[in-house]
C-alpha cells in the first residue's frame, strides 16, 4: 500500500509553558493562548483582522483541545466541542535547548542531549580570535555589529554604514547561532554565502549550531528589507534520521519546502523547494500535496510565524498569519489522497506577548489526520521524537531509538 506523509510545521507555535519552562525563564509563556486572549479582547485588531482568533480547520484537527490539555485552559474564543476530525496530542521537548535545530532534529529521531555553544555577551559577543580568523580567511577588512540583535532592527541601524564600508554585519541571539547580514546586490549574494561557509568551518568545532546568511536590499534605513535568499549552514545531525531510514528501507522521496533542508544540513533530503513568503510556502506545499508521487514525505517549515511575528513581538501580525494559514489548510485537507497522513506541529514557542524577543520553552501541538484515524486525545508526549516514531510506524519502517508511536487506526485493537 503506497502512503505519503505531509508535515506542516508552524515555526514557534507553542501552546503553553512546559514543565521545565522555569529553567529557561519562560514561566507564563503561551504563544497560542496569549495571542487568542489578545484577539478575544480586541487588542489584536488591525486593518487586516479583528475580533476573536478564527481557526476553524485547525480547531477541527484538535488545536484548541490540545492547548487545553497542555495549559489547562481553552484558548479564548475556541470551541469546547469542535467538529473534530483529527487525533491530537501535545509534546514536551527532551532536547537541552529551545532552538529550531533541536526541535526539528528531535522529531526525526535525534534529540540534542548535549549543550550547544553560545555567545552569551550582549555586546562584543564574539571572541576576538574568532573574528580575527574569519577576517584572515575571508580577507574582509572589517565588520559591524558584534552583538545580540534583532535581525530586522540591526539592518536598519547599520545598513547605511554597511553600504558605505561594505563591512558585513555580524550578530547573534540567545540561540546557538552566528548571523551575517549583507546587501544582496552591493556586497553580493555569492560573496555572502562564501563568507558564511568559511565562518561555519571556523565555528563548527565550538558546537555553534548554525551560521545564517541574511541578505537584504534597499538604499536607506526606511527601505532596507531582508530577501528570500536566506541560507542556513547547520551542523550535521549526530544520529540517523527518519529520512535516511525511509530512503534506505522504502526508497522514499523526502521533499523539503522552505528551510527544512538547511536545518537538517541536507541529510536525507531528495528534493528541495524554496519559497519567500508565507503565501509562497503555502502555494508550494499545496502543489506538492497535489503532485508528489506516492511513497513521499513532504515537510514544510512555515518560518514567518517565528521570524516575522514571534521575534518581532507582533501579536496582530501573528494572528493574521494564523488565520490566513487556516484558509490554506482547508485546501491541503481537500487535496489529501486516500492514504495520506497529515501532521501539524511546531518546534518551540516564541510568544509575541512575552518579555524579550527570544524563543520560549513551550509544549507544542501534535495534530494528526488520516481517514482511518479515530478522532481522539492521544495523550502527552515526553519527546518530540514521538512524531518521528509515529511516522516510522505508519510507513512500516524500523523503529527510531527515541519516541513512541501514538497512532491507532480504526479496526486495530
Curated annotation (Swiss-Prot):
GO terms for cellular component: cytosol. The keyword Metal-binding applies. Transmembrane segments: none annotated. Keywords: Cytoplasm, Isomerase, Manganese, Metal-binding. Mn(2+) 1 binds at residues 11, 347-348. It catalyses: 2-deoxy-alpha-D-ribose 1-phosphate = 2-deoxy-D-ribose 5-phosphate; alpha-D-ribose 1-phosphate = D-ribose 5-phosphate. Binds 2 manganese ions. It is found in: Cytoplasm. Signal peptide: none annotated. GO terms for molecular function: magnesium ion binding; manganese ion binding; phosphopentomutase activity. Its cofactor is Mn(2+). Pathway: Carbohydrate degradation; 2-deoxy-D-ribose 1-phosphate degradation; D-glyceraldehyde 3-phosphate and acetaldehyde from 2-deoxy-alpha-D-ribose 1-phosphate: step 1/2. The keyword Cell cycle does not apply. One of its GO terms (biological process) is metabolic compound salvage. It is an enzyme of class 5 (isomerase). Mn(2+) 2 binds at residues 306, 311, 359. Its main location: cytoplasm. It comes from the Bacteria. Its EC number is 5.4.2.7. NCBIfam families: deoB, PRK05362.1. Belongs to the phosphopentomutase family. Isomerase that catalyzes the conversion of deoxy-ribose 1-phosphate (dRib-1-P) and ribose 1-phosphate (Rib-1-P) to deoxy-ribose 5-phosphate (dRib-5-P) and ribose 5-phosphate (Rib-5-P), respectively. This is Phosphopentomutase.
Amino acid at each position: 500500500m503506497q502512503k505519503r506523509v505531509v508535515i506542516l510545521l508552524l515555526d514557534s507555535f507553542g501552546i503553553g509553558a512546559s514543565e521545565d519552562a522555569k529553567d529557561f525563564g519562560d514561566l507564563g509563556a503561551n504563544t497560542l493562548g496569549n495571542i487568542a486572549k489578545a484577539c478575544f479582547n480586541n487588542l489584536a485588531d488591525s486593518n487586516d483582522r479583528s475580533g476573536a482568533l478564527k481557526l476553524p480547520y485547525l480547531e477541527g484537527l484538535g488545536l484548541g483541545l490540545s492547548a487545553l490539555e497542555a495549559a489547562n485552559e481553552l484558548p479564548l474564543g475556541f470551541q469546547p466541542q469542535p467538529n473534530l476530525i483529527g487525533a491530537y496530542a501535545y509534546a514536551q521537548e527532551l532536547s537541552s535547548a529551545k532552538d529550531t535545530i533541536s526541535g526539528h532534529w528531535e522529531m526525526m529521531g535525534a534529540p540534542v542531549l548535549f549543550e550547544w555553544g553560545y555567545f552569551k555577551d550582549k555586546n562584543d559577543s564574539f571572541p576576538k580570535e574568532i573574528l580575527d580568523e574569519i577576517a584572515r580567511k575571508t580577507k574582509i577588512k572589517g565588520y559591524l555589529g558584534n552583538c545580540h540583535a534583532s535581525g530586522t532592527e540591526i539592518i536598519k541601524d547599520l545598513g547605511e554604514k554597511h553600504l558605505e564600508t561594505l563591512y558585513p554585519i555580524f550578530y547573534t541571539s540567545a540561540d546557538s547561532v552566528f548571523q551575517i547580514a549583507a546587501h544582496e546586490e552591493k556586497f553580493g549574494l555569492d560573496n555572502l554565502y562564501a563568507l558564511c561557509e568559511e565562518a561555519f568551518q571556523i565555528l563548527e568545532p565550538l558546537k555553534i549550531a548554525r551560521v545564517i546568511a541574511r541578505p537584504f536590499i534597499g538604499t536607506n534605513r526606511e527601505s532596507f528589507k531582508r530577501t528570500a535568499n536566506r541560507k542556513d549552514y547547520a551542523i550535521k545531525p549526530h544520529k540517523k534520521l527518519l529520512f535516511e531510514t525511509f530512503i534506505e528501507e522504502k526508497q522514499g522521496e523526502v521533499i523539503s519546502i522552505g528551510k527544512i533542508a538547511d536545518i537538517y544540513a541536507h541529510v536525507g533530503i531528495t528534493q528541495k523547494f524554496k519559497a519567500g513568503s508565507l503565501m509562497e510556502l503555502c502555494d508550494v506545499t499545496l502543489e506538492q500535496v497535489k503532485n508528489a508521487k506516492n511513497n513521499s514525505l513532504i515537510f514544510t517549515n512555515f518560518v514567518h510565524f517565528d521570524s516575522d511575528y514571534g521575534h518581532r513581538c507582533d501579536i496582530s501580525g501573528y494572528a493574521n498569519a494564523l488565520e490566513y494559514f487556516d484558509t490554506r489548510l482547508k485546501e491541503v485537507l481537500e487535496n489529501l489522497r486516500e492514504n495520506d497522513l497529515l501532521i501539524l506541529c511546531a518546534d518551540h514557542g516564541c510568544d509575541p506577548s512575552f518579555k524579550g524577543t527570544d524563543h520560549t520553552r513551550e509544549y507544542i501541538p501534535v495534530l494528526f489526520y488520516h481517514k482511518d484515524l479515530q478522532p481522539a486525545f492521544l495523550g502527552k508526549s515526553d519527546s518530540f521524537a514521538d512524531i518521528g516514531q509515529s511516522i516510522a510506524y505508519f510507513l512500516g519502517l524500523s523503529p527510531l531509538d527515541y519516541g513512541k508511536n501514538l497512532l491507532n487506526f480504526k479496526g486495530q485493537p
